[in-house]
From Swiss-Prot:
Compartments (UniProt record): Cytoplasm
Native species: Aliivibrio fischeri (strain ATCC 700601 / ES114) (Vibrio fischeri)
One Pfam family in the UniProt entry: Pantoate_transf
NCBIfam families: panB (TIGR00222), PRK00311.1 (NF001452)
Name of the protein in question: 3-methyl-2-oxobutanoate hydroxymethyltransferase 2
GO biological processes: pantothenate biosynthetic process
Co-factor: note: Binds 1 Mg(2+) ion per subunit.
EC number of this enzyme: 2.1.2.11
Major localization listed first in the record, in broad terms: cytoplasm
Chemical reaction(s) catalysed: 3-methyl-2-oxobutanoate + (6R)-5,10-methylene-5,6,7,8-tetrahydrofolate + H2O = 2-dehydropantoate + (6S)-5,6,7,8-tetrahydrofolate
Gene of this entry: panB2
Binding positions (Mg(2+)): D45, D84, E114
Length: 263
């Protein structure tokens, strides 16, 4: 696999070529994903749940994200790596810059932050300092205590309008990609069409530019349960390599996610 850059993601959006992405946390799995030509890997604070066994992502530290980013980069030298900024590591623009610098030095190509218009100045500052930003809207796991659980977002017209406005504001501020999580497929389609940056969905329908799933979910090894929007590809194929390839192929062909995986 050739080295993937933000230019590739932009080109895929322009020509309408769908792409898959997946979470990873260690070199061994990252190597398998690279061998199957997985173009984008997300080193997520979801490691708090699937690696550390905690009920939320809130306790994950920047040092842990740095460690896992280094591990993933060692296993996948060519994938485009997006690393999460964990809870309260970007509460001010200055704090975000310090945290992001650590992830970029560890091998990330882009950092991801959860939040809407309050992050405008942070996105501007990071972008001006050569740190590419992936915004994250919809269900934001770091805000679980605000929601009272992991719930579908953007259900009302007011919520949908605000989310679209936030997406456009973050794009204007310099965000170069966007993740939409657990929102109605119709809203995700509208946001994807109205933005010029790549939009990656998880539980956001079939019309986003890319898809992402947690690796533990597609391999059927999640500690708790597999979300409605995911699928156990390993059970269908019998090997990790075949499961990953099937996931990549079905995203490209737009056969996954199917209607039953959407809201």
């Amino acid at each position: 696999m050739k080295k993937i850059t933000i230019s590739d993601l932009n080109n895929w959006k322009e020509v309408g070529e769908k792409f898959a992405s997946i979470t990873a946390y260690d070199a061994s799995f990252a190597k398998i994903f690279e061998e199957q030509s997985m173009p984008v890997i997300i080193v997520g604070d979801s490691l708090g749940s699937v690696i550390q066994g905690k009920p939320t992502t809130l306790d994950v530290s920047i040092e842990e994200l740095v460690y896992h980013t280094k591990c993933v980069r060692a296993g996948s030298p060519n994938a485009f790596i997006i690393s999460d900024l964990p809870f309260m590591s970007y509460h001010t623009p200055e704090a975000a810059c310090g945290s992001a610098a650590k992830l970029m030095k560890a091998g990330a190509n882009m950092v991801k932050i959860e939040g809407g218009s309050w992050l405008i100045n942070t996105v501007k500052m990071l972008t001006e300092r050569a740190v590419p930003v992936c915004a994250h809207l919809g269900l934001m796991p770091q805000a679980v205590n605000i929601y009272g659980g992991y719930k579908l977002q953007g259900k009302t017209e007011e919520q949908a309008t605000k989310m679209l406005e936030n997406a456009k504001e973050l794009q204007r501020a310099g965000a170069q990609a966007l993740i939409l999580e657990c929102i109605p497929a119709k809203l995700a389609r509208q946001i994807t069409l109205e933005l010029h940056i790549p939009v990656i969905g998880i539980g956001a329908g079939n019309d986003t530019d890319g898809q992402v799933l947690v690796m533990h979910d597609i391999l059927g090894i999640s500690a708790n349960y597999i979300p409605r929007f995911s699928r156990n590809f390993l059970a269908e194929t019998g090997s990790i390599e075949a499961a990953v390839k099937k996931y990549i192929d079905e995203v490209k062909q737009q056969t996954f996610p199917g209607e039953k995986h959407c809201f």
